[in-house]
């Protein structure tokens, strides 16, 4: 048991990193829940249209996350070594890469919205106005595109701020943006205090405003402070990046980018498969994912913490300490997720009642929530394994165990059950989630083998049984 329980210094380190992230993520997801509830009060079609668009934007978001994460791996290890020039170059790389993705995403989403949204609309279940759902989704998407530039630059900055230990600025900027989003959602969705009643368009406008508030605060907090971080100085004097470093980031980061892109596409394909069970399925999945995200903040926060802690230790060549912390971080993540899983299981029958939708959709959503509640500890372990292996630069392995697994196993199971059997949504969803047990077993094996113990900046690899510095 000692392998899984840390000392006071361990928990102090984790708390210092995790608590600001947890607060930011919890507040953000809670307000997203309120945002979703406000749209959900308009009606099932509006809620479903917005949900489909957010699923499409999810792919874009994960591409940014994967692209910036590749540079972030180097940023974490550069920070561990005290190399400010290296961090500056990784931030430049992030800005250029995220900008490129944003241009591509904007063009694609603007050109074929009917095709993309329509792929999720199928006649089944108790019905629903598919034409209205499509119209609401297009209205929402058209406005959301204006917020992508701010979101892209925020992502580029925040990924580096976090790996250098500056969690407070992103947290403060995020909370301010959340407040703006919540206030303008209320004013513009329902037309309060003299503002026009814009429905889903109001929700989109509020989100876009919040994106620019967040980016403005991030920019002011990094460049406008009296003593900006050393790596910020001279950031925009040029955009040159050493060729060997750019090549390293591309080689190590490309699998991570491809992984995030194909994983997000895989998750979108899962939703598309489930959508053949009708608009009720889309609505129930939206309610489930929105409530689940509030509880997933523990998993996401611990994952980021694992990546930062392990990445910094590997960069500082403290390999034995990294090995010691690995099982402790995974155990802490699993325990915390099990605790919140119990809460989710208990509230599952009541949370869907907050939405203005049918009893059938509420029942479906409650069943999906209970499946997710039971599986939370499993997801926590696989997530901790993913971030540990990623911190060591083993991005090809994370790609195989994450996105390839999603397509080969999860999507295949969902497609067969939905298209080749008459299995209801809940049973199909259960079988797809049970496949996560296979991924957890693979992750544990990879962690125990110690293949992640390596310094990607120096290229040093440490044998599984050897001693580090």
What are these regions (language model features)?
Residues 5-37, 41-42, 58-70, 74, ...:
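N-terminal transmembrane alpha-helices
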Residues 16-35, 143, 177, 210-214, ...:
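Transmembrane helical elements of multi-pass membrane transporters/channels
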Residues 26, 30-48, 117-131, 189-198, ...:
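Helix-terminus/linker motif at the lipid-water interface of multi-pass membrane proteins
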Residues 33-37, 156-160, 183-190, 219, ...:
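Alpha-helical transmembrane segments of multipass membrane proteins
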Residues 44-55, 137, 141, 204, ...:
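Small-residue hotspots at the loop-to-helix junctions and early N-terminal turns
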Residues 47-107, 151-170, 271, 284-348, ...:
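Small-residue-rich hydrophobic transmembrane alpha-helices
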Residues 68, 143-162, 170-178, 203-218, ...:
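Short runs within selected transmembrane alpha-helices of multi-pass transporters and secretion channels
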């Amino acid at each position: 048991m000692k392998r899984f329980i840390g000392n006071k210094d361990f928990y102090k380190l984790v708390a210092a990193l995790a608590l600001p992230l947890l607060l930011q993520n919890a507040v953000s997801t809670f307000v997203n829940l309120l945002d979703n509830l406000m749209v959900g009060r308009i009606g099932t079609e509006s809620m479903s249209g917005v949900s489909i668009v957010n699923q499409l934007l999810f792919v874009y978001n994960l591409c940014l996350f994967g692209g910036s994460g590749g540079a972030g791996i180097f940023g974490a290890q550069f920070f561990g070594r005290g190399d400010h020039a290296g961090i500056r170059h990784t931030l430049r790389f992030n800005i250029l890469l995220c900008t490129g993705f944003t241009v591509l995403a904007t063009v694609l989403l603007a050109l074929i919205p009917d095709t993309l949204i329509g792929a999720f609309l199928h006649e089944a279940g108790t019905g629903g106005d598919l034409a209205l759902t499509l119209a609401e989704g297009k209205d929402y998407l058209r406005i959301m595109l204006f917020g992508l530039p701010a979101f892209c630059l925020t992502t580029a900055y925040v990924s580096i701020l976090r790996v250098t230990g500056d969690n407070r600025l992103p947290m403060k900027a995020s909370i301010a943006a959340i407040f703006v989003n919540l206030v303008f959602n209320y004013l513009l969705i329902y037309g309060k205090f003299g503002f026009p009643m814009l429905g889903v368009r109001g929700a989109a406008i509020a989100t876009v405003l919040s994106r620019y508030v967040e980016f403005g605060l991030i920019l002011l907090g990094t460049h406008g402070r009296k003593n900006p971080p050393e790596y910020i100085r001279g950031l925009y004097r040029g955009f040159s990046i050493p060729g060997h470093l750019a090549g390293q980031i591309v080689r190590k980061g490309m699998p991570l980018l491809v992984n995030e892109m194909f994983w997000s596409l895989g998750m979108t394909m899962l939703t598309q498969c489930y959508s053949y069970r009708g608009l009720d399925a889309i609505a129930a999945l939206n309610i489930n994912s929105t409530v689940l995200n509030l509880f997933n903040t523990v998993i996401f926060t611990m994952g980021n913490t694992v990546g930062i802690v392990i990445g910094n230790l590997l960069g500082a060549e403290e390999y034995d300490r990294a090995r010691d912390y690995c099982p402790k971080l995974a155990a802490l993540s699993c325990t915390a997720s099990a605790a919140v899983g119990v809460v989710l299981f208990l509230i599952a029958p009541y949370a869907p009642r907050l939405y203005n939708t049918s009893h059938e959709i509420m029942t479906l959503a409650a069943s999906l929530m209970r499946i997710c509640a039971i599986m939370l500890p499993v997801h926590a372990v696989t997530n901790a394994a993913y971030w540990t292996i990623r911190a060591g630069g083993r991005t090809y392995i994370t790609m195989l165990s994450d996105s390839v697994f999603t397509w080969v196993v999860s999507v295949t199971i969902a497609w067969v059950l939905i298209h080749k059997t008459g299995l209801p949504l809940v049973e199909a969803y259960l079988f797809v989630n049970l496949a996560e047990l296979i991924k957890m077993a693979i992750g544990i094996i990879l962690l125990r083998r110690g293949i992640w113990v390596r310094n990607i900046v120096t290229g040093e690899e440490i044998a599984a049984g050897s001693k580090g510095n």
